[in-house]
Amino acid sequence: MRQRVVRHVDARGVRVGWANGARDDARRRRRRRGGGGGDGARAVRGEDVYDATYAMRDRDYALDIAERSHATRARAAGDEWFYGELAYGDARRVLRRAARVVGWDDDDAESTSTSSTAGEFVDLGSGMGKMVTCAALTGLFARSRGVELLPELHDEASAALETFYERVRDAGMSVECSISLSLGNLLTFDVSNADVIYIHATCFTPELLHATAMKLANECKSGTRVLIMSKQLPEGWVFEAFDGGYMALAQPQTHWKLDCWMYEVRRGSSSS
């Protein structure tokens, strides 16, 4: 049974999402290749649902909410409040790679993996909830969870989640994934059952990065995969690079890409 967080959000001004020409070209290619079925067709429908959900909630809109929240009451040090997100196509690609999907870079590949797909995705600092819904749309996770520190951003993400469910129904899709968004501190959020963890750490202070690394090292099960943006975790401890350990991922509304460092938690054969 899906988990939903219902919040009342005041009406805001309409902001139309930025259209990426390269993304649209890729979508048209997937439509031609995918035909009436297969993972390529599902990827296109998922992207349509995603775009419809966040059409009025683009990156600049979310950044404005985060900035105003921080100005009203600072809950994070320095620029830790700063908002960032990934373009849908690259978010999907890196999630498929982390979930061990064979042919992760090909949307026409079958959605099968070398391990169970009934796992859990966690976004530490989930913002507008976009990675959480993207993970749900991949069909690779049984649960997709996020935690956000800023109340105003969490409220908007909760409203967007309601829109997401509406768009899924409108598209005649079925998303077999339990989705939850929580308000709270990432350092106290439960990650013990997570199979894939995503952290947009571009503006993390050294102190927060260290605390996050300690949390993951102490709480994650062996085999958990961690995707962290713009920052690196200390290798040779419990964090080992997997599958090359790196991807450059696109952001919406800019041509600049961000570094994504990819790790797997390894505790040895005697650890669980």
Regions found by a protein language model. Name each.
Residues V9, G13, G17-G21, G38-T117, H154-V191:
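S-adenosyl-L-methionine
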Residues T117-G127:
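Conserved class I S-adenosyl-L-methionine
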Residues G129-F141:
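Conserved SAM-binding loop of SAM-dependent methyltransferases across substrates and taxa
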